[in-house]
Amino acid sequence: MISKLIIVLASVLSFAHAVADKWFYSIVIDAGSKGSRVIIFKWQPETSLPRKTIQIPIQVAAKAVNPGLAAFALDPTSVKDPMKEIIDFAVDVLEPLSSVYDLIPVYLKATAGLRDLIPTARDAIMRETINFISNYSPFYFKPDQALVISGEEEGAYGWLTVNALKGVLGKDSGESTYGIIDLGGASMQVSFVPEVNHYVLQNCYPLTLTDQTTYRLYAKSYLHYGIVEANRRLAANIITENILKVDSVDVIANPCFYSGMEFSPDFATDKYKIPISVKMTGSGEFSKCVDELKRLFDKDGVQCWVRDCTFDGVYQPRLDNRHFIGAGNVGKILQIAGVPAKSSLKNVRAVASRICSMTYAQIQSEFPDESQKTQKDLCFSISYIYTLLTHGLGFTISDVSDPTQNLSQIEFTSFIDSTKVDWALGAIIYQANQQPPSTIAAYLSRTSKLDTNAVKPVVDESFKPKNRNSGTKKFEKAAIPEGAQIPNVM
């Protein structure tokens, strides 16, 4: 009996040693509103139950492919083109493990771009995508590994990403965690663990990562409050106000664009498509822009049944002094505008006012490295971010450096330690911590003679932080000039 016990213990120790030398791989396809991205992660799995350590995967390779799946609504069979490019990329990167392709899972998770489609179009795209991956991919794949995830899932995964990169997962029941505001093109997510003495009365998303670690997360997604959709809704509102004056040659003023700049607004979605040709001209008035943007957030017309509410009657726990990361387009746009990562909303307001007062020619001169669309939309974009955070979500306009203020501090960034902040890492963190030991055992058995560390990193430039020099230093130093009158808008 003792000899058998010794043999079993020796086997367990040998197995544990094997795990320390082996890497497990997974593939995540992020099917977003603007494009699809494939990200390959690796981690060293824990084989015993109950799990005591939260597994944090490492990004190995990544590639972005355009357009997004929603672009194939009229021709779903064409999804094979971006999917083939994605699968071929993963096959090449993971070539050292070609003998165990069938044990490496691939997950596709689609977000707001597909959530916003009519059901028949969404179903057709997903059906063609699942069929193609099933027939073409050599990796482990079942139909239920391709999903259109809810906005709340997206928000919860983003929260996991932020707190993993900040190194605070698994510490003191959530008190030390960060919240996240993730602003996409079509939607916006807010996720955080409220202060311990508060309840999550709605939109509760429990996350269990180990037997010792469970978080009661508040996660809420706002469809049509992404930065692209908000731009379309703003134009629709302004046109509606002027509808009696409009014909195909009328020009309507839009305060969220530079003075004198003429353009035709984009109404690419069915929800906000307007069957007339309209020209707009910018007036570059930050205060009026904020007033127009506030109308996107219904504060008075909807009953708040569960206090407290943000807008559209949506419950949100008190923000208190929770630290937040402003990610996605929040971090990206404010970095372009020259707002420091750790700054105050008062400074955001000052920079927005200054940018909106410039001409389009001045913007092109200050930001020569940015795309034409980014240049044209910068006044709108930073004004929308400011209005969303203050009027929409209720963050306080104060100097966050003042320790006497009980503030919700926001760090504006799209990257933490050079890793892009998005939901994909969080999704694979959750998946890694739910993985059955039997799957790991099968993988370890078949990779016993393989070097699982032979996979070489290959990361697309779009996944790396950009060193933006144009405009940044000037705006940091001159964001709030001495004696300047800053519009006092809330």
List PLM regions with ranges:
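Short loop/turn segments immediately following beta-strands, especially the blade-tip
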Residues: W43-S48
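Cleavable N-terminal signal peptides of Sec/SRP-targeted secreted and luminal proteins
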Residues: I2-A18
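A positional/structural detector of protein chain ends, strongest at the extreme C-terminus
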Residues: M1, I486-M490
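Cleaved targeting-peptide boundary
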Residues: V19-F24
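A short acidic Gly-Thr/Ser loop motif
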Residues: I29-R37, I181-S187
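Helical "lid/coupling" subdomains associated with nucleotide-phosphate turnover
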Residues: S26, I40, A62-S99, Y107, ...
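Beta-propeller domains
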Residues: T53-Q55
